[in-house]
Amino acid sequence: MSFAFDLIPIGLEYIAAYIEDTVEDVHIVDMELEHRTFQDLINVYSPDLVGISLSATEHNESLRLAKIAKKNGVTTVIGGYHPTSVPDLMLSSPQVDMVVRGEGELTMRELVEKGTPKDVLGASYRKDGKIVHNMDRPRIENLDTLPFPTRRLRQYPYKSQDRTTDCDVIVMSRGCNGLCSFCCEPSMSHGCLRCRSPENVMKEILEMAEYHEGRPLSVIFADPNFMGNPNRVDRLSDLLMEHDLNIEFCALVRADAMARNPEIVKKMCRAGITKFEMGIESPNSKDLKSTKKGITTRVHGEAVQNIRENGGRAGGTFVIGLPDQTAEEIKTFPTYAKEIGLTAAAFGIATPFPGTEFYRELDKQGLIFETNWNNFDEMHSVYRTQHLSKEKIEEMATYCMAKFWNIDTLIEQEKVSQQRTGRKKALVDFIRERTSNVSFLTSNGNELQKDNFGQHIKTFLEAYADPRVEAYTRKVKVQEVLEITRFLRILGPQKIQCLLNLDDTTISFVFKTTNKTVEYIRVTQGRQKDSTINLDVDLKWLSEPDHSNLVERLIFLFSHNLSTKKLWNTFKLSVAIGTELLAWNLQKTRPQKTKPPQNSVPQSPLQKSAN
């Protein structure tokens, strides 16, 4: 079973592949997608053993499921980063029979073959009321000896947010030679990086493409440090360019590796590895030093430049709420992300996971106040800092997301994609994708911050007003990035105001258009008086999924367009939107042209900065 929120449970698929010839039957259940109850699953499969893979966030839920399994007489085995770090804690719960520490393939095979954990390396268990830790199992040095993950056991369609693209995961290496104090990987791999051969990885990629029957595919290289061995990445890129695959790859990389290897970055982008997520962490050198990141801020910009010059998309993650950070420092993070040219960014709250140096330091000082493992999710503050309260840190995470994910960033994303594809984005596709993104962020934000969701929305709105959006859209012509020629011709000169409101907090998006151009987009607080079309949205709707009052909401949406002129302008907007929808649907029903090879060279360099 797996609780992986954003990744396919490939670790369990590796284990299943390694043990399936020794057991009568094996099933993989992804609890993020499973709609049946756990008791129903027990009844259907009648398992002898249930293995649960988890992180710290799933600690409580895993114990709940293990308890159900034990009530049905099923042996329970727990594994993953979290159990590896706290095996005694896991075994203190009677519903846990065994813990697999470290890599699971060989240990699980021995457990099912022997039927006992005695003398099985990497296993922890109870004997006569005492916890026994067998010796650690040596790491698997030759990863090519492992069978490929058992994708055929999947019970669920893994799709992109807009449901148009298949998704998959692959791993080229295990471990990381980094020593970041907040990361779980050093405790698992002890700075040791092991790689599969590029030929072995390429063979799996071809099998994976066949499994998805040639459909468009988005694949994440889930390696903690994909560029840990640049020569192997270089060779894999050569192999990928020998095939015309309908696959776009994303990789997790270190900024210093991307800065040092511009030629390999160029080759990766030509080969279809076009999306990159880097641990930027902070624009402040003191934060990079205190977390033992092992890089300087100088490489941030160099890495992004190398990616963008080759048509790639550069994303970065930041850590906020470190022990000595101030609110003023954190407020600079989203600005810095835009300045160095990131087109995607996430701002996670510093979380001390067991097994990390970060956890040991804070635990020693008695600073960790949170006892509910559910909140160890990088969305909640769980320890005391020098300058900021728990509530303030969580608000700052919302502030950073709002400041970065503004309209200028969304347009910049399309500008980068256009650089690679040579095509403008259709307006309907742009709106559909952004609506999907907003819905995803809202639903998950509502779930994770449900006790204070209203305040977070207000913080989001207050942070969203930004004069840089207008400056950006005056400089970067929207009509050159989005295909809106027909839309603007029908709409004509307008000043459209879309006002978002929550209680007394309002923010306005103002779109100034002519027959041929979008002159600017302005994001500002309060209602603007000189608009030609008004659209009002009450954000309380976000927390009210019931659509029974849809007519009432539509009336409210257009309630500030009562004059004859504004009604006419609103009609023109409706016709323009309807025309775009009709054209989009007609386009979708036409036979699609053959997709150009992934290894086509980008047309021209991108600007280094989003602003």
Locate each region found by the language model.
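Structural recognition of alpha->loop->beta junctions
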Residues: 89-107, 265-275, 332-347
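N-terminal [4Fe-4S]-dependent radical SAM core
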Residues: 117-120, 126-172
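Radical SAM enzyme core and accessory elements
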Residues: 1, 380-476, 590-611
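Flexible glycine/acidic-rich beta-alpha junction loops that bind and position SAM and/or redox cofactors
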Residues: 1-2, 178, 225, 231, ...
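Radical SAM [4Fe-4S] cluster-binding motif and immediate context
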Residues: 148-315, 322, 328, 332-335
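Glycine-rich beta-alpha loop elements in corrinoid/cobalamin-binding modules
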Residues: 11, 18-140, 355
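Feature captures hydrophobic
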Residues: 449-611
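Glycine- and acidic-residue-enriched helix-capping/strand-helix junction motifs
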Residues: 2-12
